[in-house]
Amino acid sequence: MGEFFADLATALPRLLGDGLQATLISFAGGAVVMVIVAVALGVAGHQGPKWLQVISRVTVEFFRGTSLVVQLFFIFYFIPTFTGVDLGSTWTAILALGLNYGAYGAEVVRGSLNAVPAGQWESTTALSMPWMTKMRRVIWPQAWALMLPGFNNLMVMLIKGTAVVGLVLLSDLTFEAEQVRRQVGTWPAFIAALIIYYVIALIVSTIMRVMESRAQRRLGLGDYEIRKARKDAANALSGGTAGGAAGGVLTPDAASLIPDPGRGERDA
């Protein structure tokens, strides 16, 4: 047992150095790209003209239907060969992770927009709100609160997805664990990596849950409404319709849907 902990102590510094840094950079960059891609494709698939919806759907299905490993190799080898632009290992990892998980995130965005009650859309139309004002002041605050649980799951999946970026010569946590394994054995190296991955996922998940709670409190949602809103979003993602989600989870008065920054504090 003493030898095990000695080997574990040997493994940790290397894993917490270059390995952890590469993993965190890949995750942070991939998360930014993922959110941008998810919002762009999700809104286009829900609100765009027919031709834009088709492009959004084809793009989503392409990145969801092909392997992340294949996408990594495609970006790493194909783009430099045919364009002369060498992205390097780090940018290849960020781009591949962002596009792959962004395609899944697009369905989270589209499903959350579907889950906003139909009465809210009708209210904004009756008030002749411009599209940008409608989305920013009424629709998006509701949809954002419904998106966060799905984005929470995707963030955790993204963290685990960084384990394959070593295939494009990036010295991430898993790559460094494999190097340490050759020196001190399998158990210490990968137990250390497991603990580090878990801690990262726990921190990210906690932050996302805090964001989710704040977004829902700003809309004045109680525990029952929060659970029902989550269920409606899940139904929309699994093929439900907006009509099925329009059960009055949120107040139908469009004016009352404008987020009140002080509401959360007053409710508390």
Regions found by a protein language model. Give the residues of each.
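Transmembrane alpha-helices and adjacent helix-loop boundaries
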Residues: 1-268
